[in-house]
Curated annotation (Swiss-Prot):
Domain named ABC transporter: residues: 630-853, 1257-1489
Main subcellular location of this protein, as a coarse class: membrane
UniProt-recorded name of the protein: ABC transporter C family member 9
Catalytic activity: ATP + H2O + xenobioticSide 1 = ADP + phosphate + xenobioticSide 2
């Protein structure tokens, strides 16, 4: 009992001192802490107020007018946050004032027996809350956008004080409740609301201007804030109130729309500005820069940058997580009191039971709110970090040096973006478990100590021992994860390279070889995955068995120490052990996530520290200060700085503005490297490079972006019709545009796959011209176009529209040299000669060799022409008529002629996405892949046995334990604990069986799916690769496959496990009170409704998220390939902005998927709380004796986890369905229509086929797709065996398509092709392609060695390989390398020149020695001298074999036995060169005449050379 306070009677200083000495009494502890806190707060507040007043006095009058104008034009619209904070503050103030009135009337309002303490506490509280209320009112007048930090700190401290003391006294004491208890409960609820407001921080004010526009109230930088607010104006989350954010009701409109119809991309709202990629990237960039300045390079700076970037949001999440972890243990803490209440119901008031039920319910609601907020906050933070990391990985990719690009291939970098970033952001979700874990453990130990005494020490020791076991397991898992990522990198690297060069593999019949290569790499990855999953299964067995082990050890210790195990104590302990399951069960996932994120973070940190292109390699000068456009002094450059021989040495170059500089030389002499030195792409070892003016660059290998032709030409510039028309005319593109279905708006496939080499070259030349640069660097711009088009480009573009510009152009075609102001002759990385054309010829040092080779070719043409007819020199009119005649033969690669203009055709098809519910066949396909689904029932059986044994063990302890300390147990404690231990051990073994079965089934299924998808992709026709971006395929091979490898089986397993668990929980609760089933039925119906209401929206959002991920990878792959061009055009910022837009496009559906999940979980949790509260009220209300208190306590124990289980069931089902989309996507690529069989048994050709080499085309018609017009039309002709056939025609006339039809890359839609009396459509593709040889137009080398690229099937000896290398003029180059045949070839052969790559391809056919050889522009990238040598070698090696040559160089085909002229996809002419030249009106004759006229000014060079 407590004494009356009697303030009137207690007087005198002695009495006052005595009262203050009594503050040590524990009943007055709250009052003592409260007084200290209020005094501290008031002191700080007064000091702060004084400082503010002093500042106002000093600045008085400076801003009075401005503030008055603001107040006159702006009115404030109050928000929910502000109103509730004011209401709560005033209500708490009123409560304390009322208590003061009661104290003056000598009323007993508290348990504290010190009247001075109580009075002082209430006075200080009243003053404090009075100040708080005044401050809140003043906030409105001051129009603050955020509550002051001091006020928010006070609200936080008040909540902690109320929660720590009030909740304890209300629930733990069994005396009648005082008025103070009810007042404290009211204050606790009000403090809870104020806590939420303080965490959010914002007042939510909106200002209403005189114009009527409503804008958020701003502080500081008004402009920047306005930008943010306008960005988030369309974001429901950004505009949501506090209540909407707590309940996630801001997403309701999206659910309403998604329930009515499938969502489209435009239906998804924008994300908040702070979640946007631009904001996140900028913020993270600031952290990186400041951290790197302080700490220098190393992985540590990356970790610290990430920490500084996330810490604010992470700290808020941590507060929610800590409160969540604390409130979760209130239930187990109260179970003993509840069992005692049920056991002694007659002596207890029902109010006390209801109050206990209210305590349970309040704790569960707080737990739900805080849990949902920290989980959502973690996902939101993960989204922000993902955006920041992807952005920086992309930005780094644009500036990587050549050495860094060699060590980090596209496949590896794509892995960083798709897998490593995902693992790091996933860890953000787990990171709160790090500080939740100790709180959960020590809360559990505290509860155990309260009920079991020193037995709790055994629980603590056992728990720490179990966790200590994880240390070696974690280290081992980390090694496995590192191995997995390295193996995945190797697989993705190979896959990316293969997809880019799939056409080469099919032409060479190497697809099976490279398929086996990927399978071998996958086998290595599979072995690493199996080791990891096997270890994870063992770890799960240990940790899932840990709660049972801890409970057995604890109970045995209690028995040995004589601690009485009553039913209440046992049930409280069991509930605590059950709560411990969450942190201990989650420990493997936490450790796995920690290990995976550590490995991934190290990889990204290492990547971000790779060397970049030299920023000081080039000095940029103003055009006003120098007459030189380009200047190099004493320059030395190298692609491999560590090499003893620089790539370029002793470079001296001065180029005046407006000069035309030609660069020529043999293959590998350093021509392209010279241009790279001007661009700053190659490492500068010494010297100075100065550039004055804007640059434009045209690379040797065309780089074309997916999109329209116009987009590629504009390249980010504004469209100006006159300028655009001049550009396309100068680049000879007008005819192509006229013949395309959509003109210049025709869509280009990935890497310009649907364009000829000449068209791609002219498009990128037009891109450079349109930029109106000062300096143009053109790397072999004429090699891919025919002679007529080359002349047009040179005259109209180089010498026409660019006549006043500075142009440096690399060329092998000597006819373009005389017009140059300066010619540079390169040899072995040095400028051996420099001067005008005539000057160089007179020097007789080496230039005459190049010119001589050209003249020899020209002489051969002239001699054939003269032998056919008397050659007459044409006049200017003749030249004009020839050009006009040639123009009439214009066509495009796909021959989309004018009559087909109306036929619209989209090359790159939109990604196929399913709509609506994921079909049952997808689930069945996944579940029945391994052994017809035989493992599934065994997995479910193992989990069912685990659940039954768990329930049996808990039921056994509840039934056998005595209800009170005085009761006699039904059995001896030794027997009780022995049975319990056996049941617990059995349940642990079931867990082991389940985890192993899930690991085996999941990984085997993933492997089967991967094999099917891989084989399906390799067997797909080329049309699939033409219309499918590489990034889209890689997305399935990386991200989706990773889901199948590590997540899918676990997610589906948890669906079954959680359903089994909730069925067990309902069973136990119904055993206690069957009436629970009555309320559970409608609640279950409501849950099902919510799930069905949620699923359509979440499913479509997940699909969108998966689809929107691929464009990020595709854009990145394209940007990496064209990084040099992007830097040369100074377009980095534009491409970075495009990347940020793509990230936001993916973040929008992803963010709303996460929000939708929390929306559902919040509502399901509330429904489960309703069931639990109903159960508690029912147990309190039922008369004594109706139920066994121990069994009732067991029901409450299980009921505590009902909310988690109920939400887990729906959450797991929805999450599994979202993950099942990856299965659906992989299944799509497992059913790609296949090309023809590789081998057809019964229709195999003879081993020596083709022995003659005759090729007959009969009424051949080819189209690339059903919706495309015909490309080749009615081709009928015969190539006799052993003859040399030349195929000519203007760029895009269908020459390459004819070759593709010959190799069946594209199947004939009509007609046949017969080789040596064998219809090629009747035999297998490998039997056809392996017997033919080809040197393709685009030379491709694979990552590896020279030996691997020449002989990938390992069929030839070193002697044979060296013989082929010498013949293709690469012997000296390869012998100069230390590794020789094992010399390194990096991705795409980037460390070899284009000409050298083409020579390697020549070496392949020399080794193969096929009876039919196809040369598709085989020597386009080599100089005339080398071309002449190669032609002689081919004539010698294949003199009795059929050689089909496609070439733009006339001398290459002039000596052919027959010439086929194609025009408009039809045969224009087909005869011997001599007969065609006899006809003056023949296309071939006019082509020769035009070439002769263009080269006529070389006639005098023979005299100079003689």
């Amino acid at each position: 009992m407590f004494k009356p306070f009697g303030f009137a009677a207690e007087t005198g200083s002695h009495l006052l001192t005595t009262q203050w000495l009594q503050l040590g009494n524990s009943l007055c502890l709250k009052e003592r802490i409260s007084i200290a806190m209020q005094v501290t707060f008031l002191a700080f507040f007064l000091i702060h107020l004084a400082l503010k007043w002093f500042g106002v006095v000093r600045n008085r009058g400076s801003n009075d007018v401005e503030e008055d104008l603001k107040k006159q034009s702006i009115t404030v619209k109050q928000s929910f946050s502000y109103n509730i904070s004011l209401l709560c503050s005033v209500s708490i103030l009123g409560t304390h004032c009322f208590i003061l009135l009661l104290l003056f009337r000598d009323s007993v309002v508290s348990r504290c027996d010190s009247s001075v303490s109580v009075f002082s506490a209430e006075v200080s509280q009243s003053f404090s809350w009075l100040f708080v209320s005044v401050v809140v009112v003043k906030i409105r007048e001051r129009r603050l956008v955020k509550f002051p930090w001091m006020l928010r700190s006070w609200w936080l401290c008040s909540f902690i004080l109320s929660f720590s003391f009030d909740a304890h006294f209300i629930t733990a004491k069994h005396e009648p409740l005082e008025f103070q208890d009810y007042a404290d409960l009211t204050g606790l609820l009000a403090s809870l609301f104020l806590l939420a407001v303080s965490i959010r921080g914002k007042t939510g004010f909106h200002l209403l201007e005189s114009s009527g526009n409503t804008e958020p109230l701003l502080l500081g930088d008004q402009t920047e804030q306005n930008k943010k607010d306008s960005y988030s104006s369309s974001s429901p989350y950004g505009n949501a109130t506090l209540f909407q954010r707590i309940t996630f009701s801001w997403i309701n409109p999206l659910f309403s729309l998604g329930y009515k119809r499938p969502l489209e991309k435009d239906d998804v709202p924008d994300i908040d500005v702070k979640d946007s990629a631009r904001f996140c990237s900028h913020a993270f960039d600031q952290k990186l820069k400041t951290t790197k300045e302080k700490e220098g390079p190393g992985n540590a700076f990356f970790y610290n940058s990430v920490l500084r970037y996330v810490w604010r949001k992470a700290a808020i999440n941590a507060v929610f997580a800590v409160v969540n972890a604390s409130t979760a243990y209130i239930g187990p803490y109260l179970i003993n009191d509840f069992v005692e209440f049920l056991s002694e119901k007659q002596s207890q008031s029902l109010n006390h039971g209801y109050l206990l039920a209210l305590g349970f319910l309040t704790a569960k609601i707080v737990e739900t709110v805080t849990q949902r907020q920290w989980i959502f906050g973690a996902r939101q933070l993960g989204l922000r970090l993902r955006a920041a990391l992807i952005s920086h990985i992309y930005q780094k990719g644009l500036v990587l040096s050549s050495q860094s690009r060699q060590s980090h291939t596209s496949g590896e970098i794509i892995n960083y973006m798709s897998v490593d970033v995902q693992r790091i952001t996933d860890f953000i979700w787990y990171v709160n478990n790090i500080w939740m874990l100790p709180i959960q453990i020590f809360s559990a130990i505290y509860i155990l100590q309260k009920h079991l005494g020193l037995g709790a020490l055994a629980a603590l020791v056992t728990t720490l021992m179990v966790m200590a076991c994880n240390y070696p397991l974690t280290r081992l898992q980390r090694n496995y994860q590192s191995d997995i990522m390295n193996a995945k990198d190797d697989r993705m690297k190979a896959t990316s390279e293969i997809l880019k060069n799939m056409k080469i593999l099919k032409l060479q019949a190497w697809d099976n070889q490279f398929l086996n290569k990927v399978k071998t790499l996958r086998k290595k990855e599979y072995d690493c995955l199996w080791k990891s999953l096997r270890l994870q299964a063992f770890t799960t067995f240990i940790l899932w068995g840990a709660p049972s082990l801890i409970s057995v050890v604890t109970f045995v210790t209690c028995m040995l120490m004589g601690v009485k195990l009553t039913a209440g104590a046992v049930l409280s302990a069991l509930a605590t052990f059950q709560m411990l399951q969450s942190p201990i069960f989650g420990l493997p996932d936490l450790l796995s996530a920690l290990v995976q994120s550590k490995v991934s973070a190290d990889r990204i940190a290492s990547y971000l520290q790779q060397s970049e292109t030299q920023k000081d390699a080039v000095e940029y000068c103003s055009k006003d200060h120098t007459e030189l456009s380009v200047e190099i002094e004493n320059g030395a450059f190298s692609w491999e700085p560590e090499s003893s021989r620089p790539t370029l040495d002793d470079i001296e170059l001065k180029v005046k503005s407006g000069m035309k500089v030609a660069v020529c030389g043999a293959v590998g002499s350093g021509k392209s490297s010279l241009l790279s030195s001007i661009l700053g792409e190659i490492q500068k070892l010494k010297g100075t490079v100065r550039v004055s003016g804007k640059q434009a660059y045209v690379p040797q290998s065309p780089w074309i972006l997916s999109g329209t032709i116009r987009d590629n030409i504009l390249f980010g510039s504004m469209y100006e019709s006159e300028k655009y028309e001049r550009t396309v005319k100068a680049c000879a593109l007008i005819k192509d545009f006229e013949l395309f279905s959509n003109g210049d708006l025709t869509e280009i496939g990935e890497r310009g796959i649907n364009m000829s080499g000449g068209q791609k070259q002219r498009i990128q030349i037009a891109r450079a011209v349109y930029q109106n640069a000062d300096i143009y660097l053109l790397d072999d711009p004429f090699s891919a176009v025919d002679a007529h088009t080359g002349r047009e480009l040179f005259e109209d573009c180089l010498m026409g529209i660019l006549k006043d510009k500075t142009v440096l152009y690399v060329t092998h075609q000597v006819e373009f040299l005389p017009a140059a102001d300066l010619i540079l002759v390169m040899q072995n990385g040095r400028v051996m000669q420099a001067g005008k054309f005539e000057e160089l010829l007179k020097q007789n040092i080496g230039f005459e060799v190049l010119v001589g080779a050209h003249n020899e070719a020209l002489d051969s043409i002239l001699s054939i022409e003269k032998s056919s007819r008397n050659f007459k020199e044409g006049s200017k009119d003749d030249t004009a008529s020839i050009a006009e005649s040639l123009q009439t033969h214009c066509d495009s690669e796909h021959n989309i002629s004018t009559e087909n203009k109306k036929k619209e055709a989209k090359l790159v098809q939109d990604e196929e996405t399913e709509k609506g519910v994921i079909g049952k066949e997808v689930y069945l396909a996944y579940l029945t892949t391994v052994k017809g689904g035989l493992l599934v029932p065994f997995i479910i059986l193992a989990q069912s046995c685990f659940q039954m044994l768990q329930i049996a063990s808990n039921y056994w302890m509840a039934w056998t334990a005595p209800p009170t300390a005085e009761s006699i147990p039904k059995l001896g404690m030794g027997r009780i604990l022995l049975v319990y231990a056996l049941l617990a051990a059995g349940s642990s073994l079931c867990v082991l069986a389940r985890t192993i079965l899930v690991a085996i089934g999941g990984l085997s299924t993933a492997e089967t799916f991967f094999s099917r998808m891989l084989c399906s992709i390799f067997r797909a026709p080329m049309s699939f690769f033409d219309s499918t971006p590489t990034g889209r395929i890689l997305n399935r091979a990386s991200t989706d496959q990773s889901v199948l490898d590590l997540e899918m089986a676990v997610k589906l397993g948890w669906c079954a496990f959680s359903i089994i668990q909730i069925v067990g929980t309902i069973f136990v609760m119904s055993q206690v009170a069957w009436q629970v089933c009555v309320i559970f039925i409608p609640v279950a119906v409501a849950c099902v409704f919510y799930q069905r209401y949620y699923t359509p929206t979440a499913r479509e959002l997940s699909r969108m998220s998966g689809v929107e991920r691929a464009p990020i990878l595709h854009h990145f792959a394209e940007s990496l390939a064209g990084a040099t061009t992007i830097r040369a055009f100074d377009q980095r910022d534009r491409f970075i902005s495009s990347n940020l837009v793509l990230i936001d496009s993916h973040s929008r559906p992803w963010f709303h998927v996460a929000s939708a999940m929390e929306w559902l979980s919040f509502r399901l949790n509330l429904l489960s709380h309703f069931v639990f509260a109903f159960s508690l009220v029912l147990l309190v209300t039922l008369p004594e004796g109706v139920i066994n208190p121990s069994i009732a306590g067991l029901g409450v124990t299980y009921g505590l986890s009902l909310n988690v289980l109920q939400a887990t069931v729906i959450w797991n089902i929805c999450n599994a369905e979202n993950k099942m989309i990856s299965v659906e996507r992989i299944l799509q690529y497992s059913k790609i229509p296949s090309e023809a069989p590789l081998v057809i048994d019964g229709h195999r050709p003879l081993d020596n086929w083709p022995n003659v080499g005759s090729i007959v085309f009969r009424d051949l018609q080819v189209r690339y797709a059903e919706h495309f017009p015909a490309v080749l039309k009615n081709i009928t002709c015969e190539f006799p065996g052993g003859k040399k056939i030349g195929v000519v025609g203007r760029t895009g006339s269908g020459k390459s398509t004819l070759i593709q039809a010959l190799f069946r890359i594209v199947e004939p839609s009509q007609g046949t092709i017969v080789i040596d009396n064998v219809d090629i459509t009747k035999i297998g593709l490998h039997d056809l392609r392996s017997r033919l040889g080809i040197i393709p137009q685009d030379p491709a080398l694979f990552d590896g060695t020279i030996r691997l690229n020449l002989d990938p099937l390992a069929q030839y000896t070193d002697h044979e390989i060296w013989e082929a290398i010498d013949k293709c003029q690469l012997g000296d180059v390869i012998r100069a390398k230390d590794e020789r045949l094992d010399a390194t070839v990096v991705e795409n052969g980037e460390n070899w020149s284009v000409g050298q790559r083409q020579l390697v391809c020549l070496g392949r056919v020399l080794l193969k020695k096929s009876n039919i050889l196809v040369l598709d522009e085989a020597t386009a990238s080599v100089d005339s001298a080398t071309d002449g040598v190669i032609q002689k070698i081919i004539n010698q090696e294949f003199k009795d074999r059929t050689v089909v040559t496609i070439a733009h160089r006339i001398h290459t085909v002039i000596e052919s036995d027959l010439v086929l002229v194609l025009s408009d996809g039809r045969i224009a002419e087909f005869d011997s060169p001599a007969k065609l030249l006899q006809r003056e009106d023949s296309f071939f004759s006019k082509l020769i005449k035009e070439y002769s006229l263009r080269s006529n000014h070389f006639a005098g060079s023979n005299d100079l050379l003689s």
